[in-house]
């Protein structure tokens, strides 16, 4: 099915990940190690001699990474702002999603196919939502980050003004959306309703006002959670 992930964070704070300063880079590496570290496995190899090979050592230590697991090389390339090849982008997005759970004011993941996303906008239009405030408009802007979408993935960004206006307009029409189709819209609306509070906190903490980074991931991308809603909040 895939999943729609909403991240409340200023776009400049997202861009700061790529080519991070020393303080942020230290945090990113620590979060990556805590989430993606794997134990060292001990493999016993037979002792045999060959005219072409040296004597094999009986115990060789190596890290066995699960398929699709990000590597230390991926971490360093992202932190240093280096180019990421397309065949590495899916696992690098696993890293970025993990970092966003720590850096964002809040985040949520909503199980949703592309077809369902488009259907929701049709439902909302029928309920009277102006097209200016459709869900698709929350993905209108290009985040302009070095890490491009993995195959099948879609990303977009919306600024604070668009977010708050969409929240107001959604609040006015949600009651006329059929109850059977209201779950995903309610999840989006609940998330957007937190923005006024986050904006006040941002001023108090000297951080930029949060925007909205939207990531739609197909079910082939790891860390999409199609089985249920997930959400979290931070204010660090």
Predicted segment positions?
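Acidic (Asp/Glu-rich) sequence patches and key acidic residues
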Residues: 1-208, 217-236
């Amino acid at each position: 099915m895939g999943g729609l992930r909403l991240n409340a964070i200023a776009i400049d704070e997202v861009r700061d990940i790529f080519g991070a300063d020393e303080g942020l880079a230290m945090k990113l590496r620590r979060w990556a190690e805590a989430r993606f570290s794997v134990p060292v496995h001990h493999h016993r190899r037979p002792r045999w001699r060959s005219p072409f090979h040296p004597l094999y050592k009986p115990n060789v230590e190596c890290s066995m990474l699960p398929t699709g697991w990000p590597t230390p090389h991926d971490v360093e390339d992202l932190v240093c702002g280096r180019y990421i090849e397309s065949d590495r982008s899916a696992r690098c997005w696993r890293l970025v999603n993990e970092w966003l759970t720590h850096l964002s004011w809040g985040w949520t993941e909503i199980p949703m196919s592309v077809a369902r996303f488009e259907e929701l906008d049709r439902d909302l239009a029928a309920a009277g939502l102006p097209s200016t405030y459709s869900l698709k408009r929350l993905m209108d802007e290009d985040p302009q980050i070095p890490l491009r979408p993995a195959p099948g993935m879609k990303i977009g960004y919306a600024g604070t003004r668009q977010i708050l206006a969409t929240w107001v307009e959604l609040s006015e029409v949600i009651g006329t959306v059929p109850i059977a189709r209201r779950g995903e819209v309610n999840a989006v609306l609940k998330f957007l309703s937190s923005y006024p509070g986050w904006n006040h906190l941002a001023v108090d903490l000297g951080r930029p006002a949060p925007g909205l980074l939207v990531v739609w991931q197909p079910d082939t991308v790891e860390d999409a959670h199609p089985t249920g809603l997930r959400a979290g909040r931070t204010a660090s």
